[in-house]
Swiss-Prot record:
Described purpose of this protein according to its UniProt entry: Mediates the nuclear localization of the ribonucleotide reductase.
GO cellular component, as recorded: cytoplasm; nucleus
Primary location recorded for the protein, binned into one broad class: cytoplasm
Entry annotated with the keyword Thylakoid: no
Provenance organism: Lachancea thermotolerans (strain ATCC 56472 / CBS 6340 / NRRL Y-8284)
Record family assignment: Belongs to the DIF1/spd1 family.
Record has Nucleus as a keyword: yes
Localization terms from the record: Cytoplasm; Nucleus
Keywords, sorted A to Z: Cytoplasm, Nucleus
Name of the molecule in the record: Damage-regulated import facilitator 1
Stored Pfam families: RNR_inhib
Region (Disordered): 70-97
Length: 128
């Protein structure tokens, strides 16, 4: 009873098949070799490149000089007025917090009046 438990293999293992092609063994490990190359940063065996060259080679190509032209800001003539930051289309003046509060007070008062009219006194209840 003091024996340590051991795992037993219940199934049958897959037998190694004969290679149909000479490179079949190399193809079976290509996924792992690709992952290792990516992990190493595509460094080829031999002398390691300089850090600056390694960084430049691993960066994505920068096309910002071609796609983003250099715009030069020209000052506005003094005869023209700067555009308004706020105008009638960006701000609505038809409503304000004060108007909303007044309407809220009126609505609450109307609700209170309706509730007071709908209440019945104890004597008016005929269900008893």
């Amino acid at each position: 009873m003091t024996e340590s438990p051991q795992k037993r293999h219940l199934g049958q293992g897959i037998e190694r098949q004969n290679e149909q092609y000479a490179c079949q063994g190399a193809l079976s490990t290509i996924g792992m070799r690709i992952r290792q190359s990516v992990d190493r940063g595509y460094q080829v065996s031999g002398a390691a490149p300089a850090p600056a060259a390694r960084t430049a080679a691993s960066c994505v190509q920068d096309n910002s000089e071609l796609t983003i032209p250099d715009y030069k800001r020209v000052p506005m003539p003094s005869s023209k007025q700067a555009p308004m930051l706020v105008n009638s289309r960006t701000v609505s003046s038809s409503s304000s917090l004060e108007m909303w509060e007044n309407q809220l007070d009126e609505r609450l008062e109307h609700i209170d009046n309706d509730i007071m009219r709908n209440k019945r006194a104890f004597e008016q209840v005929e269900d008893w």
